[in-house]
Amino acid sequence: MQKQEKIIEMFNQIAPTYDKANRILSFGADVAWRKKACQRVMSLYLKKDLKIADIACGTGDMIEIWQESALKMEKNILNIKGIDPSSGMLNVAKEKFPNVEFIEAGAQNLPLESQSLDILSISYGIRNVVERQKALSEFARVLQKDGILVVLEFTKREKGGFIAACRDFYLKNILPSIGGIISKNKSAYEYLPNSIEGFLSKEEFILELKNAGFEILDYKSFSFGVSSMFIAKKL
C-alpha cells in the first residue's frame, strides 16, 4: 500500500470518533481557530456572493463555520462543496450536513472546473498530502483570479523554551494516549506529532505558496504557535 493510501485508510478507521477526539485533544481550540480563519477571509474578500470548496474536509467542521461566518458577515454562499479522499470521513459529514455536496477525491486531483471558486480552504490536511506541490497547483487552477486560499495547519516549531517543550511533551506523550483511548487506534494519534515534525516551517510553506502562484495576504499563529493560519491570494 502506498503512503497516501495508508494515510487515507488511517482516517477511515478513526472517522467515527474523529469529532469527539478533536474537541477533547484541542480543548475545543480547533473550533476557535477555524472561526478566526473564516472570519478573517470574509473580511478580506469583498465579494458578496461566494463559491467555496473545503478540501480535506473530514467530517465537515469547516462547512458549518463557513456558513455561520457568511451569515454573520452578511454574505451569500452560492455553492459550497466538501472534498476528501476518506470515504469514512465523508460518511460522517453527509450525516451531519445532508444538504451539502461532498465529493470523494484527493487534493492533488480536484474534480472542479478551472477558475470556478472564490474561496478554497484546507484545515489540518495539507501536511497529509504526499504530492503537496501538485495540490497547491490544483488550488491555483480552480480559484478565480484574486480568489482566496486559506490554510490552517500545525507547523514545525521554530523556537525552543518552556512553552515549546510543553507543546512537544503533550503532542508526543499525552495526545497519542488519549487519542488512542477515544478511537481505539493509538497509532493514528502517534502519526500526528510525527507528521508535524516532518512538515515545513512557516517560511518554507510560505515559499511553496509563492512558487505555486499565490501572494500572502495574512499569517497568524494561534495558541503559542501550535496552529498557523495562512491566507493567500491567487495572482
From Swiss-Prot:
One of its GO terms (molecular function) is demethylmenaquinone methyltransferase activity. One of its GO terms (biological process) is menaquinone biosynthetic process. The keyword S-adenosyl-L-methionine applies. Keywords: Menaquinone biosynthesis, Methyltransferase, S-adenosyl-L-methionine, Transferase, Ubiquinone biosynthesis. InterPro entries: SAM-dependent_MTases_sf, UbiE/COQ5_MeTrFase, UbiE/COQ5_MeTrFase_CS. Its EC number is 2.1.1.163, 2.1.1.201. S-adenosyl-L-methionine binds at residues 59, 84, 123. PANTHER family: 2-METHOXY-6-POLYPRENYL-1,4-BENZOQUINOL METHYLASE, MITOCHONDRIAL, METHYLTRANSFERASE. Methyltransferase required for the conversion of demethylmenaquinol (DMKH2) to menaquinol (MKH2) and the conversion of 2-polyprenyl-6-methoxy-1,4-benzoquinol (DDMQH2) to 2-polyprenyl-3-methyl-6-methoxy-1,4-benzoquinol (DMQH2). This is Ubiquinone/menaquinone biosynthesis C-methyltransferase UbiE. It comes from Campylobacter jejuni subsp. jejuni serotype O:23/36 (strain 81-176).
